[in-house]
């Protein structure tokens, strides 16, 4: 297929048109008074959203070169969302502003490579300045404020996320689901829970709830199948003498072994229950080891030279209670040493940082949460499915922003942080590098200007007021139209969101500025289909 090539300013100008069209669609969602965007779906009701990345993902342009420009900035929004969970609109607005300002200078004769170098130096200095003006998150009030802002000023969502994080801790897993009603709900599973239920209903101790409830049980962990009762007898006799209940977690228990355990339970000889070990393969071994560390026990493993017959009561873990239903097992207050649990948590965090697989990362985070203290489930309620999707998007954004804030700290929000950080940066660059740095500094006003514009205020006046202020916490509250102390007003942003948005925006804008040619396929207009054969109509002449 024939290709079309554009060079120099012509190529960059067409790329800019695509970036501008994407930015114009995304920027309207910015700030507390940002507007919604209605997105047509191939089937079903249209999607209403105020989420920048959701808008960006839907933008596909007819012109091939314009679409290339738009797709690069779309990647900025997606990458920012993946890394920080929020700041997608900020990243898009910054990328557009940097490219626009840079294009003007490159067209006027500036060297794009030198300009890029100056931009990179300015960004590195700005990130250090951001860290210097940041504060650590000190309590659930600030967590609620961050979540509220990210959820488009919805205080109920902010409170819900703050409550969830308070209950499960910063490393706990918080999942978002759709509720069956119009009310938002928060439920918390304390302790370690895994998705394996009892092996026999005869183990049930609470018939009303159809649950097995064990108080202060011993916990035996074995990584193979148990089919022969003879191997179990030594440890069973020791547990019976202690008078405590026993939970067996093994790959499987079947045949004679399971039947004998059930008979002993029914006769009241031993209060016992059994479940399959969670996970598969290497993940199962890791989870058994997690349970062992949490409960202060040991995994009886033939790989370590241990047989089930050699197990003693000293190898067993303990917990204050265990609850088992047909689908799940929950271990509460394991007797493991805190230092051992903390060491295991550190090890899992290191594995999360190293892994490149999203699936492995998700599973490792689940394990981390189970060791750290629980899982919280936020159930989002709404009157219609369309509203539910929009609200769920906002809760996901707010949750990610909150995690980012806990991780790297907070700065003033409302688009002011980058402007305030730039006041302490003075690199004294020369030539085209200085132009690159100035391009970034000018672009830093764009998010604040857009927030003010969306709220119906004069963008230039607002940006100038923040820029000339001597107060390090000064900013503009677009919801009320007042200049305030941003920390006192609770208008705060995570440092990570600002940092990632700036880095990604400059990265793609500098790539676009240093583009000297574009190559794309020529779209060929499809020929009109031929008229159908009018055979048989010729005989109409005889009708005259």
Curated annotation (Swiss-Prot):
Source species: Campylobacter concisus (strain 13826)
Protein name as it appears in the record: Chaperonin GroEL
Subcellular location: Cytoplasm
Entry keywords, A to Z: ATP-binding, Chaperone, Cytoplasm, Isomerase, Nucleotide-binding
HAMAP family in the record: CH60
Major enzyme class: isomerase
Role, per record: Together with its co-chaperonin GroES, plays an essential role in assisting protein folding. The GroEL-GroES system forms a nano-cage that allows encapsulation of the non-native substrate proteins and provides a physical environment optimized to promote and accelerate protein folding.
Cytoplasm recorded as keyword: yes
Gene: groEL
Record field: transmembrane: none
A GO molecular-function descriptor: isomerase activity
GO biological process: protein refolding
Catalytic activity from the UniProt record: ATP + H2O + a folded polypeptide = ADP + phosphate + an unfolded polypeptide
